[in-house]
A protein has these predicted regions:
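Polytopic alpha-helical membrane-helix bundles and their juxtamembrane interface segments
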Residues: 1-54, 61-81, 88-226
Length: 226
């Protein structure tokens, strides 16, 4: 039986959904600033990738608010923007962080392979779940590389915060995808998501504070023209 989005969400629940979106968006901005501090050439691409992630989250939150309001207004394009924006945005952030880890800008094209394949698969099946898988993989990758960067700086608390983010990224989507959930369960899931995204933001802030400003000239990615 198809789920009617107009009866799925309460207005207060839909409004609260903006909080984890804003926390995640702030986290991606801070990560972009941290990456740019260590490797100036990746600053703008990382910030643009973070903006793409935030755009997708805001589009989904606005959609949820519109279907929860009276009268219900359902614009599926807003809902369907989420996973494409997450997949490509997270891929861009991952590329920037790999460059920071290596000390030189990474080639961007390998990081586009999975999002492009996910987009093609989504078009083929008429659903965005392939891009959901790509977004989850990229988000976990960001968490892992962020843990390594935090540990390299001796920041164990930062590593714990990013670990919480990874666990939440893996556990919450399957739970949230179950149909016909009670409002209490949805509040629990959304509150947990807020804490997960807060952990991501706090970990990113700690990473930014411990990232020194780059003073050395950057090494170009392998294969780049000189």
């Amino acid at each position: 039986m198809a789920i009617d989005p107009c009866t799925e969400y309460g207005l207060a629940l839909a409004a609260e959904d903006f909080l984890p979106v804003l926390l995640a968006g702030a986290g991606t901005v801070v990560l972009g600033l941290a990456a740019g501090r260590a490797l100036p050439s990746v600053r703008i691409p990382a910030l643009l990738a973070g903006a793409l992630v935030t755009l997708g989250g805001l589009a989904k939150a606005i959609w949820k608010l519109l279907v929860a309001a009276e009268p219900c207004r359902n614009y599926p394009v807003l809902e369907n923007l989420l996973f494409p924006c997450l997949a490509f945005g997270f891929a861009g952030i991952a590329c920037a962080l790999v460059g920071v880890w290596r000390g030189r800008q990474a080639s961007w094209w390998p990081f586009l392979v999975l999002p492009v394949l996910g987009g093609v698969a989504s078009l083929a099946v008429g659903d965005t779940w392939p891009l959901l898988i790509v977004a989850a993989i990229a988000a976990v990758f960001i968490g892992v590389i962020s843990i390594r960067l935090a540990l390299r700086d001796g920041d164990r608390l930062g590593a714990v915060l990013f670990t919480v983010y990874i666990v939440g990224t893996l556990v919450l989507p399957p739970l949230a995808g179950r149909p016909h959930q009670s409002e209490q369960l949805q509040w629990g899931e959304q509150g947990t998501n807020t804490l997960v995204q807060l952990s991501f933001l706090l970990g990113a802030i700690r990473l930014l504070r411990r990232t020194p400003v780059s003073a050395a000239p950057e090494r170009k990615p392998v294969g780049a023209h000189r």
